[in-house]
Amino acid sequence: MIMGGVRELLLVVMTVGVVKVSCYPVGKSQKQDQVSLQRRLGELSSNDVSIVHALALLRSIGSDAKQAREEYLETNEVESQASPNHGSSPANDALSSEEKLRRVSSDDAATSEAATGPSGDDATSEAATGPSGDDATSEAATGPSGDDATSEAATGPSGDDATSEAATGPSGDDATSEAATGPSGDDATSEAATGPSGDDATSEAATGPSGDDATSEAATGPSGDDATSEAATGPSGDDATSEAATGPSGDDATSEAATGPSGDDATSEAATGPSGDDATSEAATGPSGDDATSEAATGPSGDDATSEAATGPSGDDATSEAATGPSGDDATSEAATGPSGDDATSEAATGPSGDDATSEAATGPSGDDATSEAATGPSGDDATSEAATGPSGDDATSEAATGPSGDDATSEAATGPSGDDATSEAATGPSGDDATSEAATGPSGDDATSEAATGPSGDDATSEAATGPSGDDATSEAATGPSGDDATSEAATGPSGDDATSEAATGPSGDDATSEAATGPSGDDATSEAATGPSGDDAMDI
């Protein structure tokens, strides 16, 4: 034990001695060293004396090496002055290479340092505030990513396969997204803004964690069983359930609330970034660049099914985007400023949908079967709910924000509607499961029913929002805008870009089943146009 400590102390002293020798002044003589060492020897024990002797030996070796180096340099200088090519003499080359070696001596042979710290394993990028920890991780805005299929977020990277990271921290395991202020702790669990969850598929409320599977706690109290929706102050907590505006859920087919993204399959991204694979919507400032890939605001993606978020990307299929971008595949609901993009998806807040069985937004009515009319006029056929200015009048119709619904699996949001299976989110929050839309201040709670903060839905697959209705078998429209076509919903200011991809707010898409953004029309089949231009395909009513 004592010898181990002495050995460690000797190593430390030797290291310090080597450093001092390298920085030792040239003009100081060895005699002064010996005098100072002899003065200290009387104050030291036997172990210390042996250490000091070792240090003196090291210094002596260093001094000898320094003298030999000086003699070598002087000899080379004399030879260089005597040689005809003295401008490019070997001495000068030796000096320059010595300077280069000194500058790079501290660098490791295969290590690149991140802008704020080094990464720690293969294909790992470091986030702006912390590194991720496994393969297929995209790097944050301060460093590059390192492997295929990785999207880099403008301010934060994801942390493993199919995981999107929140804007300020990385996730830590598979299919887990981290909330904006803390990391999750197990598979498919997203953490709420103020605390972590504790088991699988559990989302935490803004003020406390839940305690069992598939249960989310409300901001003021927990729910008690599966498929239970929470009140206006907290989210539900089981599979396919979307979380309320103050925290994200954490399992499959769950959309995240406005403060953080989820991290596994069929998960919608939080308010600061888009999803990132096939049928993925593009971020708010640029178009996508390959099959179903959207490009982020600060750079392009690099392989298929990768989208880069403006501030953070999601990472897998069936992901809906939060309040700043649209989602891009089946059964995905979009957040408050962008629409989803496929069948049975509700559209975001600023434009109408454009195909069969789609409800129209608050600024115009739809024109086909099973479509609910917006706040300015009623619909006229079966299974249609009326907007906020009047009630519907037949079976399976939900009433507006001043009355409750009356049948299965539909929730109405305070400011936006649900729809049915894979239905859209209300104007301020996303839906969360197979057929649930989330209300403006709270989420749904079971397989097909979430009730809004001020009123319920009204029929088998349609819930009407306070200012706009849903529109067909699987599509509910948001309070001010509709969905877009068979598989694409357009964002509030821009269109999607491929077969199941919605584009972000500043660039259009270019292929089938793409909806056009608010500033220009689309040009191919099954494309819905945004709020300022007409569509032009087979199944579009505007």
From Swiss-Prot:
Low complexity: compositionally biased ranges: 107-116
InterPro entries reported for this sequence: PSGP (IPR009900)
Annotated TM spans: none
Coiled coil start-end: none
Propeptide, residue positions: 22-120, 537-542
Tissue: Cortical alveoli of immature ovaries.
Repeat is among the record's keywords: yes
Residue spans of biased composition, Polar residues class: 78-95
Post-translational events: Most sialic acid residues exist in the form of polysialyl groups partly capped with deaminoneuraminic acid.
Role, per record: In response to egg activation, PSGP is discharged by exocytosis into the perivitelline space, where it undergoes rapid proteolysis into glycotridecapeptides. During fertilization and/or early development the glycotridecapeptides prevent polyspermy or are involved in the formation of a fertilization membrane.
Name of this protein: Polysialoglycoprotein
Species assigned in the record: Oncorhynchus mykiss (Rainbow trout)
Taxon lineage: Eukaryota, Metazoa, Chordata, Craniata, Vertebrata
